[in-house]
Amino acid sequence: MNDSITIGFDAKRIVRNNTGLGSYGRTLVRDLAYLPDSLRLRLYAPDKGRDNLRSQIEGLPRISFCYPKESIFPFEKALWRDAGIVRDLMKDKVQVYHGLSGELPRGIRKSGIKSVVTIHDLIFLRHPEFYPWIDAKIYAWKFRRTIKEADHIIAISECTKRDVLELGQVDPSRVSVVYQSCAPRFTKVPTPVEEEQVRLKYGLPKRFVLNVGTIEQRKNILLGVKAMESLPSDLSLVIVGRHTAYTNQVLEYISAHKLHRRVYILHDVPDADLPALYAQAEAFVYPSVYEGFGIPIIEAISCGLPVVGCTGSCLEEAGGPDSLYVAPDDPEALAAAIRQVLKGAPGREERIQRSRQYIRRFEGNDVARQVLEIYQRIL
């Protein structure tokens, strides 16, 4: 491609969210920035957000951040992101606007600017019980409005695409599956010194399986806690994630069943420490009831861990055929699957190597190239 394309991005989550939507946005924009094509990447955020997140991509080639001109109140920031941003996009001659977190501003279609939206999941429609009633209604309304505005929709898994087609009644030609890549830090092997520093910092046990993700009902980590009762007594579970009200339920179970010496819950863990945490675990456990994709699975496999997940959504797409999957309500089955992938289990190393080969399809350059082809197609 010879002519430069100016791409605008919804960067609110990029500068505010450490995991999930924020991680997706930062990784994709970084991968696009390193393509050899002539691109201008303009990131539109209502404010500068968190320095430690913005700095991960600020200063990369072709990237510039854009903010509202005035010093505005929070409700005005929301209005700007919802509609007012379109004026700035037109002024900046943006050709394609990409809503990275399932939303597009009102009026984007009328402006003549082409638009792409990434839909991560439709859990608020599939499982509204995991959301406050009003939140589920708002998310559903935004989804239906957004798919009418979008020129093209990216689903981050085949599972999400099926949900979009069924629940959004969208023409299949408007939806493409483009998987998510993980941050490059997970492909670098931590040094023994780095591992020991992290072990001492968090007081890690000698043997453990790991879970990473928000500690919420949908993520279902209580199943992992219950599975520990059927696993060797020298094996622990380390849970890394943001606390929610569900965390209290997990803590109550741990206390009632005297598992406090075998279950460790860590929060506010910096991204930089995660590779060393993964590297010291024996396996990764991800018993989520429903996901849009499951990027921690890719991170774990990149770090050389076997994975045990649950059936029922998209986790088989992320983990591939050499990860193990059980029903999300069967702690005994989860315990049995974990036993199959602990150190010393037959075929463990071969399973890890095949899984590493499988996740090559999620490499950042390939993902960025697929997204760029969508931009070019709709122009």
Where do the protein language model's features map onto the residues?
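Carbohydrate transferase catalytic cores enriched for Leloir-type hexosyltransferases
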Residues: 1-379
